[in-house]
Amino acid sequence: ELKDIQKNCLRNNISIVLQEPFLFSKTIKENITITNKDTDFEEVRSVTRISHIDDSINKFKDGYDTPVGEKGTTLSGGQKQRVAIARALLKKTPILIFDDSLSAVDTETDFQIRKSLKEYEKEATTLIITHRISTAKDADLIIVLDDGKIIESGNHNELISKDGLYKKIYDIQTKMV
């Protein structure tokens, strides 16, 4: 059971990126390497490219040495999320959890990050919690929750054919585009 696993073991094997990530009053680089301080710069660049934040960082006057301020106040919501994704990837855990962690980025950036993560995901089990069908539809298994209960599961095509809640959300979101 999960309660029998030591917290240290969980922390060392799971990386979580929250919708509202916490950033420290340090530089961008220090925020990314906080759990892996001895990382060489090329590894840092690699994970920032996957999270599509590298170009934004390079536009800052001080680049990776840019201070982010208290709780990351100098960064936009999407930039904070992408820095947190880079930090999680750098930790190299076998389990990654993204809890609506792309909600503050536009759909094109969301698509580019998911595309970049495909290669990385071969080395880790990835759980993505999202309200965006475009983010969920390529998953091997989609679990639909309603009021905290599992009501449907399957891949995108299976869930569309079931004509349940997933299909209703899909119809609403595709009409909005």
What does each of the following model-derived ranges do?
Residues 4, 11, 29-70, 114, ...:
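ABC ATPase nucleotide-binding domain helical subdomain, centered on the C-loop/LSGGQ "ABC signature"
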Residues 59-63, 115, 119, 123, ...:
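C-terminal portion of ABC ATPase nucleotide-binding domains
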Residues 85, 129:
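Hydrophobic anchor residue at the start of the ABC signature
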Residues 90-94, 123:
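A short, proline-enriched helix->beta-strand linker immediately N-terminal to the Walker B motif
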Residues 96-100:
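Catalytic Walker B motif of ABC-type/P-loop ATPase nucleotide-binding domains
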Residues 106-116:
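Conserved D-loop/post-Walker B switch-helix segment of ABC ATPase nucleotide-binding domains
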